[in-house]
C-alpha cells in the first residue's frame, strides 16, 4: 500500500514539473501583502527627556534623538514588482535540467524498488503458509460435517490483553498521597 502511495506521489511530482514548461513562476510577480504607504514614513525617535522617580535608583541612559527606521515600503501593494535575479537558473540549458531530473527520478525509482523487494524478502512466508493451511482445514471440516459445532474459544482475561492498565483505586490513592506529600514540602 505504501508503495502505491509513493508511486502516485512520484507521478504527481512529475506532472507538476512537466506542467511548468521550464518556467519559474516565482519570478513573474511575487505576491506582496497590502499595506498603506505611510506605515514607516515617520522615523521613530528616542528622547532623553524622561525622568525617573527619585525613590528608585534606576539611571535612565542619556540618548540623543536617533532615527531607527527608514521608509522601505512601496506606496502600493499593486505597484509593479521588481525583477528577481535568476541568472543562475536561466544559464542552465534545458538538457542539463532534464539530465538532473532523470537522475533524481532514477534514484527515487531505485528506492521504491528496494523498499518493495525488502518488504517481499522480509515477509514471514512460513507462518503465512501454516495459517493458510489451518484455514483450509477448518473450512473443509466445516462443510464436511454440516451438523458440526463451531468451536468458540474463550477469550483471555482482560488483564492479559490490556497493554496499558487503567489506574485502579489503590494506584490513584497512592498518586494523590504522593502529590499531597510534595505540596507539603
UniProtKB/Swiss-Prot annotation:
Name of the molecule in the record: Uncharacterized protein C05B5.2
Q: Which UniProt keywords apply?
A: Membrane, Transmembrane, Transmembrane helix
Q: Which organism is it from?
A: Caenorhabditis elegans
Its record classes its membrane topology as: Multi-pass membrane protein
Q: Where in the cell is it found?
A: Membrane
**A GO cellular-component term linked to this record:** membrane
The residue ranges crossing the membrane are 1-19, 105-125
Amino acid at each position: 500500500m505504501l508503495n502505491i502511495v509513493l508511486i502516485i506521489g512520484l507521478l504527481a511530482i512529475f506532472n507538476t514539473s512537466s506542467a511548468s514548461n521550464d518556467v519559474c513562476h516565482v519570478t513573474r510577480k511575487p505576491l506582496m501583502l497590502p499595506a498603506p504607504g505611510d506605515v514607516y514614513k515617520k522615523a521613530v525617535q528616542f528622547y532623553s527627556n524622561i525622568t525617573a522617580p527619585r525613590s528608585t535608583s534606576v539611571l535612565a541612559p542619556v540618548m540623543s534623538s536617533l532615527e531607527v527606521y527608514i521608509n522601505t515600503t512601496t506606496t502600493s501593494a499593486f505597484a509593479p514588482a521588481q525583477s528577481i535575479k535568476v541568472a543562475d537558473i536561466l544559464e542552465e540549458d534545458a538538457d542539463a535540467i532534464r539530465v538532473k531530473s532523470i537522475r533524481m527520478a532514477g534514484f527515487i525509482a531505485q528506492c521504491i524498488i528496494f523498499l518493495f523487494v525488502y518488504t517481499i524478502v522480509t515477509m514471514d512466508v512460513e507462518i503465512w503458509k501454516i495459517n493458510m493451511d489451518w484455514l483450509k482445514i477448518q473450512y473443509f471440516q466445516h462443510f464436511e460435517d454440516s451438523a458440526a459445532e463451531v468451536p468458540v474459544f474463550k477469550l483471555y482475561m482482560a488483564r492479559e490483553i490490556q497493554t496499558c492498565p487503567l489506574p485502579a483505586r489503590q494506584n490513584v490513592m497512592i498518586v494523590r498521597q504522593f502529590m499531597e506529600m510534595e505540596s507539603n514540602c
